[in-house]
Amino acid sequence: MGGVLSYFRGLLGSREMRILILGLDGAGKTTILYRLQVGEVVTTIPTIGFNVEQVTYKNLKFQVWDLGGQTSIRPYWRCYYSNTDAIIYVVDSADRDRIGISKDELLYMLREEELAGAILVVLANKQDMDGCMTVAEVHHALGLENLKNRTFQIFKTSATKGEGLDQAMDWLSNTLQSRK
């Protein structure tokens, strides 16, 4: 297991937690999934459908679902919402042209009753790219300041470099632990 996964082993109870990784196509969802699972970047192709992996962080078991982000696939995200403990929403911080679409998809998803209690982790990904939006810009562009009754946090990440993922997963695990 990668460093991030072994880092979480023993932290929480043994109940399997259901995590969805969502976001537009090309945001870095699959790269993040496998960076968390094996601790390194693997070659990926666009996800048509989903990838699902079982991962263990310390004592907490995760069933992590990486759902494709193409326009034609997004309507099917709702088929996976049931019993979700947390959502990792990945944003391509370098894609200024589609940040409005990302906001619309995020807000549409968060209106779903099945996700009412799910923790939200927003990853402002691709922070290593020139001209990318800052975390504050992504926060504002997504309208996160308007979220009410939702436990959430945003993190600056670079999936390819592995930056920021430990902090995000540490916050998520601590937040899940506090709900036990």
Curated annotation (Swiss-Prot):
Gene Ontology process terms (BP): endoplasmic reticulum membrane organization; Golgi organization; intracellular protein transport; neurotransmitter secretion; protein localization to Golgi apparatus; protein localization to Golgi membrane; regulation of cell migration; regulation of ER to Golgi vesicle-mediated transport
Secretion signal, residue range per the UniProt entry: none
Pfam families reported for this sequence: Arf
Domain of life: Eukaryota
Chain residues that bind GTP: 23-30, 66-70, 125-128
UniProt keywords, alphabetically: GTP-binding, Lipoprotein, Myristate, Nucleotide-binding
Lipidation (N-myristoyl glycine): 2
GO molecular function, one term: protein domain specific binding
Gene3D superfamilies documented for this protein: P-loop containing nucleotide triphosphate hydrolases
An example Gene Ontology CC term for this record: presynapse
PROSITE patterns found in the cross-reference section: ARF
Similarity annotation: Belongs to the small GTPase superfamily. Arf family.
Known function: GTP-binding protein involved in protein trafficking; may modulate vesicle budding and uncoating within the Golgi apparatus.
NCBIfam families xref list: small_GTP (TIGR00231)
Protein name: ADP-ribosylation factor-like protein 1
Source organism: Drosophila melanogaster
Gene name as annotated: Arl1
